[in-house]
């Protein structure tokens, strides 16, 4: 059923039309140019495919949506005019058009939203997560490795995923470690621990006399979020 929903959502419509190209479509957890990013390697698991979505829903026992349970999609403090609110409405419409299932949108106060989420009392939610540190562990291990109720946002569990995350946490060799994360992300996308929708775009402006911000392997000069610890940054003479 999760796989059917994943293939029924058109990430490109959400990113390019609804959110006006301020984001890029997402098919996995790690965003473009994030450490461990593997391009479109795992995209097929969650790309928009209406026929495949209908087939999977039929195999799950709900042909043309018949007998599908009533489900609410929770959002926290996000009215219909917000980014989350607009995306929720589009997802609601797409699931109706592709799978003939009706999802109700429930907007609740933020504290209630997170309390119920960590109690695993939300059947379906729409939200986001920002990394704590630039490493796959932050977006894969911290968010998705299974934990007891009250310690994580969801009750999704996959033993192979957990094993790979734990191996990566102990591994010292860079290539081997990132290989574990690559396979873990494949498991996450294919088993649909979550349906991935978009990654935000960030734009930086800085004065020419700000020096010492190091170029990363993709030619960018990141200075945002948790990429702000630079011991060689200084003010130069160019003004």
Language-model regions: role of each:
Residues 3, 7, 12, 16, ...:
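Solvent-exposed, polar/charged alpha-helical surfaces in well-ordered, non-transmembrane soluble domains
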Residues 25-60, 78-86:
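Structural transition elements
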Residues 16-21, 28-29, 83-87, 136-139, ...:
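Short, solvent-exposed loop/turn and secondary-structure capping segments
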Residues 21-24, 30-31, 129-132, 195-203:
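Short, solvent-exposed turn/loop segments enriched in Gly/Ser/Thr/Pro and often Arg
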Residues 13-18, 111-144, 188-189:
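Pocket-flanking alpha-helical
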Residues 15-17, 100-107, 194-196:
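Acidic/polar loop patches that form or flank catalytic/metal-binding clefts of enzymes
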């Amino acid at each position: 059923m999760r796989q059917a929903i994943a293939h029924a959502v058109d990430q490109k419509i959400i990113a390019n039309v609804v959110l006006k190209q301020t984001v890029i479509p997402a098919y996995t957890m790690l965003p473009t140019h994030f450490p461990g990013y593997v391009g479109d390697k795992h995209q097929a698991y969650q790309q928009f495919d209406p026929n495949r979505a209908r087939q999977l829903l039929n195999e799950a026992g709900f042909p043309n949506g018949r007998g599908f349970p009533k489900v609410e999609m929770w959002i926290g403090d996000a009215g219909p005019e917000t980014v989350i609110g607009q995306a929720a409405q589009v997802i609601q419409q797409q699931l109706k058009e592709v799978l003939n299932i009706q999802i109700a949108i429930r907007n609740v106060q933020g504290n209630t939203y997170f309390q119920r989420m960590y109690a695993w009392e939300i059947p379906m939610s729409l939200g986001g997560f920002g990394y704590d540190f630039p490493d796959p562990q932050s977006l894969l291990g911290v968010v998705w490795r299974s934990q007891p109720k009250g310690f994580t946002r969801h009750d999704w569990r996959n033993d192979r995923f957990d094993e790979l995350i734990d191996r990566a946490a102990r591994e010292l060799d860079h290539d081997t470690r990132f290989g574990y994360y690559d396979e873990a992300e494949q498991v996450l996308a294919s088993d649909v621990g979550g349906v991935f929708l978009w990654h935000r775009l960030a734009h930086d402006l800085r004065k020419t006399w700000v020096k010492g911000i190091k170029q990363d392997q993709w030619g960018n000069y990141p200075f945002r979020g948790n990429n702000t610890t630079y011991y060689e940054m200084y003010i130069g003479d160019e003004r």
